[in-house]
């Protein structure tokens, strides 16, 4: 899986349907400064997560359109808004 740097975070890039649906689910908690960038995505869930996450939603110009911190496991839907096209998931810092 390809890695990129975005918003000061080294992130693995989820491109395929399976990678995007899974996100960080089932992965060990990433250390600070690492996460997953999910492309073609404007909403996430935290089913099956074992730790809280932070999510930063970006528009097509990589501008932040929404930031949500401390999303607990088993949350149904976190929506980034109509302009969001990708989301960066990291382990929560809160």
Regions found by a protein language model. Give the residues of each.
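Compact, glycine-rich, soluble single-domain proteins
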Residues: 1-94
